Amino acid sequence: MVAEPHSETSSTPRRRRWRTTAAVTLFTAVLAACGGGGGSGGGSAPNGDVPSNEPPPPVPSAPAAQPTTAADAVRLADQASFGPTEALVTTIKAQGAAAWVAAQMALPATSRYSSGQGDAIHTYTGTADFCTGRGDDCWRDWYSTSPLLWDFYRNAVGQPDQLRQRTAFALQQILVVSNLDVSGTYGFRNYHNNLLAYAFGNYRDVLRKVTLSPVMGDFLNNANNDKDAPNENYARELLQLFSIGTCELESDGSLKGGKCSPTYTNDTVRAYAYALTGWTYPAGGASRYGCWPKGANCTYYGGDMVKVDQYHDTKERQLLGGVKLASGHTADTALETVLDSVMNHPNTPPFIGKQLIQQLVSSNPSSAYVGRVSAAFAAGSYKGFGTGKRGDLAATVAAVLLDDEARTETPGRSAGKLREPVMMFTGVLRALDGTTDGDALGWWWGETMQQHVFRPPSVFNFYPPDYPVPGTTLVGPTFGIHNANTALNRLNFLVYLLDWGGSSATGSTVPGAVGTKVNLAAMSTDAANAGTLVDRLSMLALGRTLPATARTEVVKAVEASGSNAANRVKTAAYLVFGAPQYHVQR
């Protein structure tokens, strides 16, 4: 059993386990039978927050409603939201996939990051430690991403703009920054609000905001980069992770010529590093030690980085695709040329398109599927979605979700993906009418399951997109953080919600604390009939009933749990959401 969080006192009584040994034993039988082992929105923005002034992308014309099946509705909810609810499944069934995606893209962005403190950590000039007199939660509220994590989970569980949030979450796992290396709550708030704002915009605009982000500038050493000997970190990751990848690709994502031909050399990286010199923090920061280097701004995260001409390298530089920066160019010209060169590279559509498929739908998409998504990215349009401009994310996301391979009722053996911990947390909470303030899902469960949102271990995220599944020829990114301990802790998370009752708000210092808990009242209406209850939960979790043998065992366990409605629902929910079919999302 995983330990309780440090915020719990040793005097807190443990709740008695409701499951009998027999019920736990039955879980093993189920595994064998299965073939396997409230939003935080309003209020004024704290200092340093920068609202997006970009016009929203055009709303796609609404496709006609084409009702679909419950199985397809649950599958789409798994792919495009933070988990099915009965109300969401009903909506998707009535609208159909295309109409629902269009309706989601037309929704206003109700989810934004707003919790935490402002920019005073970068305007403070006093001699005492900044946190002196600011209470025990100073580091949490001013420096860490814990306040963003509260907003993330509150919005994921409760806000309606689900597709925008899922797309932004996919982007943040490609365009990675980490609170492990950079501190400043308000800066991370700006960075991730930009990903939400541009989720259905253009990938070129996303790359521009990321390149000019002072948080990214600190994370990958491009802020105040020395023109005489520039740090190459950001230039390398811009090419390797954020745009073209390391091997030349066909438009369907396969290796060009059947082997890895490098897309760039060290000289190429160096040329991009020189091209991206000359950017410093936005104005607004202060320090009692003064700003360094001379002529640059002090550390400050309240906006995009700004150019300092004297620190920009103006020599002729050769970029990819035959693009050349002429001698005497400006920092602005260099930036736009860099972005054009990577956006026009033939690798970018399949490289980014495949990662979006992996994040939303399937770890091992067919080359044909990647090719169709790549074509949508390149054309900027897909069946009425998009502006017709290369890199349009509305078109690309629509292509990912509406492709036949995503919508098929009979997915192939290599289709689907291991449900990542974040999606398990939110999926169970949403399915069981849960609420959360997010607090328990960070330092406790996020750390336990190796996916503490906003704190990936490196720029390579929590797991690489090409992580090999042992003993197979498949890749499974989420398997990079999956092992015997995390597999057991998936079940322990269900124990935490169903047996312990989750977490309460008592004693919490989280603003607007509600704890983390589920509400089983709606499911209790079917508790008297074990078969009906199990099927209702299975349809919500899987989009179908459990396989016959597994269903029989789960129904027996529910019937053996007694007549208490709550215990019957807990037993059924534990066994359904603990089943392998739930954790392997297909």
PLM features per residue range, with description:
Residues 1-32:
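Sec-dependent bacterial lipoprotein signal peptides
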Residues 144-148, 158-166:
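Amphipathic interfacial helices
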Residues 163-167, 179-186, 229:
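Short, flexible active-site-proximal loops enriched in glycine and acidic residues
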